[in-house]
């Protein structure tokens, strides 16, 4: 099948086939101010730059300072003095999960509105972008930041939406709401009557009450422009590029201007840094990679100790992404940063214990590494369930799972040395 690298070129090709972009142009990308969304956009920025376009990408200073992304070939528009939205979101989501509290999904809307408000009211940022004389904008398609479409509207420049959101309301997709699993549930495509009611309500609610945007956003932030309700402006996007596909996800209807491009951020592994390479090469019995994402590095002590107890007892090595010290550095490598895709590409990687973010999920699929899913919040439960349905993972609740159960689950999904793949390990569909 077509490779994920070709999928990435398809994204670029699709964007550039717009009537507005034929030759080398000036493109501005504006992702959600979180590591995973910014990382995804950098892959597209690199591909655009390699095609001869001039590319700029907005990034808050707290991400710029971490220097964890490859920003060669394009220019960063640094957003200074912005709150750390990564911390704000984790306080309302991950911390509530670990405290057994109900998830506060409106924290996304509040953070997104504040982020958009700061950008859209900032004259310096607008003038900086205006000076670039951009020909095209690529905006994050999450509902929380869709008001950013006001910037290209003020400049009279076309725009596209790119990201993980399959939003039937703003993308104008005709559906039977009860039949499509909503991304904020853990439902699959085989639903009970109650689950269908929940799907119906969740799909219908944003079309009635959208708490993530201001309907009068155009008059608020661009009073000099002809008034448009924000949902009408959003619908003017030239194209919607949605990071999902029918290999991993359930069948979904689309419109002609909605393209499903799942897995575009994946690709072959790069050479590992020395400390990781030596550890992986020596692990002939295999390695389990454990991570809860770039946003969850400080786990509760009880969870951390549970994981360390399991990793210590496993008959093979492990790499644990967290702000902790390893009790046995020969067997457990701990780090606050890991080259995730490159580790998953290593032949000694056996199992991936993951929170089920979109990037990691597609990387695991690309490298055919089975997953023990530990979802924490938002769409991660949906992601975990669709992997389970595809026979490519098993889900555990990291809050309640016992040490023995977690160990047994990891060992169950680990291939033996005698075979290159376990019976459960999925073939590499995405290549």
Describe these PLM feature segments.
Residues 153, 364-365, 388:
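Short alpha-helix at the nucleotide-sugar/activated-sugar donor binding site of glycosyltransferases
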Residues 18-34:
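Nucleotide-activated donor-dependent transferases that construct or modify glycoconjugates
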Residues 137-139, 336-384:
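A donor-sugar binding/catalytic signature common to diverse glycosyltransferases
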Residues 36-39:
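Short N-terminal binding/cap micro-motifs at the start of the first secondary-structure element
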Residues 3-21, 387:
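Cleavable N-terminal signal peptides of Sec/SRP-targeted secreted and luminal proteins
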Residues 389-394, 399, 411-428:
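Conserved donor-nucleotide binding/catalytic region of nucleotide-linked donor-dependent transferases
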Residues 25-27, 287, 370:
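Residues that mark the start of a beta-strand
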Residues 33, 43-330, 337, 403, ...:
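Nucleotide-sugar-dependent glycosyltransferase catalytic domains
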